[in-house]
């Protein structure tokens, strides 16, 4: 349930390739310095590049070890719950704060998509409108039709 919301991911990000590479384990005093994943900008004609990184937290019985993400709006630091995912554009610097007790284990991977960040932002906002309109089936249906049309056109 928490680990992967298929409808949300397919609607907003339109993934065409997901790579789950490894898991990390952090114990007391472990951390991961702020860094940017070593992927180059995506050429228009080649979709083998990864657009997003993700980290899925497997345990939550530890202290510290916040997932840190530096965005254009500022830095975010959040302790992820078990099963919670942090999904972010790979161009954003990120890291893990110092674990003060317990064991932090997470799965690391990357995802590519056929659409741009800007297009994904539009689909995200349409998704939010659709979720707010679930009681009004007519509006919900119209929003879903627009989402599906845009996904089809943008994924070409």
Region roles according to the model:
Residues 1-85, 91, 97-156:
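Fe(II)/2-oxoglutarate oxygenase catalytic core
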